Amino acid sequence: MEITKDTIKHVATLSRLAFNEEELDKFTDQMGSIINMADQLSEVDTEGVEETVQVVDRDTVFREDIPEHWQGQTRETLMENVPEKANGYIKVPVIINKDEDE
């Protein structure tokens, strides 16, 4: 599969990203290298090699989702490290603007 500058532009548009010409050239080369590596892997003879789903011989272990209290830490001391706060909450930048979707 050949990766062209148009392919990168298309994916960038779908991702709502904007790249200049230098970045397009760089990403086209990088993605081309990645795809070439994947193509090389598909040429490896795996005849007789048993399929592997998980390389570690153990089941997935989940812990209970229980909040842990950090010794000596309070909500106030943790909030001291927050760059922006509003009404006692952490203030983060807007990611999705509902006005843009309408």
From Swiss-Prot:
EC number: 6.3.5.-
Keywords attached to this entry: ATP-binding, Ligase, Nucleotide-binding, Protein biosynthesis
One GO MF term attached to the UniProt entry: ATP binding
Catalytic EC class: ligase
InterPro entries: Asp/Glu-ADT_sf_sub_c, GatC
A Pfam family matched in the record: GatC
rRNA processing recorded as keyword: no
Record flagged with keyword Ion transport: no
Gene Ontology biological process terms, A to Z: glutaminyl-tRNAGln biosynthesis via transamidation; regulation of translational fidelity; translation
Reactions that this protein is recorded to catalyse: L-glutamyl-tRNA(Gln) + L-glutamine + ATP + H2O = L-glutaminyl-tRNA(Gln) + L-glutamate + ADP + phosphate + H(+); L-aspartyl-tRNA(Asn) + L-glutamine + ATP + H2O = L-asparaginyl-tRNA(Asn) + L-glutamate + ADP + phosphate + 2 H(+)
Function: Allows the formation of correctly charged Asn-tRNA(Asn) or Gln-tRNA(Gln) through the transamidation of misacylated Asp-tRNA(Asn) or Glu-tRNA(Gln) in organisms which lack either or both of asparaginyl-tRNA or glutaminyl-tRNA synthetases. The reaction takes place in the presence of glutamine and ATP through an activated phospho-Asp-tRNA(Asn) or phospho-Glu-tRNA(Gln).
Entry similarity comment: Belongs to the GatC family.
NCBIfam families referenced in this protein's UniProt entry, alphabetically: gatC (TIGR00135)
PANTHER family: GLUTAMYL-TRNA(GLN) AMIDOTRANSFERASE SUBUNIT C, MITOCHONDRIAL
Self-association and partners: Heterotrimer of A, B and C subunits.
Protein name in UniProt: Aspartyl/glutamyl-tRNA(Asn/Gln) amidotransferase subunit C
